[in-house]
Amino acid sequence: SQYLEVGIGPDAEIFTKCQPMGSVGYGADIGLHPISKWNNPEPEIALAVTSAGKIIGATLGNDVNLRDVEGRSALLLGKAKDNNASAALGPFVRLFGDGFSHDDVKAAEVSLEVRGQDGFVLDGTSRMSEISRTPESLVKAAVGPHHQYPDGLVLYLGTMFAPVKDREGPGKGFTHKIGDVVTISSPKLGALVNTVRLSTECPPWTYGTRQLMSDL
């Protein structure tokens, strides 16, 4: 399958989640494209990486995913992954140093809780030790002589969690509902909390590079 290929094949899955300054942080709404009827959170650790490919820190991330769109065709990955408010990061970037190292990332457990207004609760865990590719190998696949990021990048590392708990009835599986509160946490990286909305109803992304340079 296409998922097995990127899991154990020669090339990792690397894609653009959002443009610089396009992610949302702690407490913000996260967005689902209105066309999606089957979607899910993806609790992940994300690395802060310099333009030279040096990993300097880590944070938590939610790689909001439209499973029905991605499942239709691999060519729709951009539509499944990159929408308004579909990339969440936070609550802070913890820099590597005394008390926190690359080994902590590799051994980390990332917990997920989805709590719906309908009383539904979903819990899960993603263990970094079970991911088939090392953080360093993913960074090398993303940045290097073959592809540059002059201002650095934040790289989501993937997840081992896939929601299977039925929500609407036996065999119907999981999908988000508007108003779900998603909490992603790890002991050394805190907790990232967001509320699910439609991407068309989340605040539009208006602050880009031009506005940043104007403010400077």
Enumerate the language-model features and the residues they cover.
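Catalytic-pocket segment enriched in acidic/His residues
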Residues: 67-216
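Active-site microenvironments in enzyme catalytic cores
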Residues: 1-116
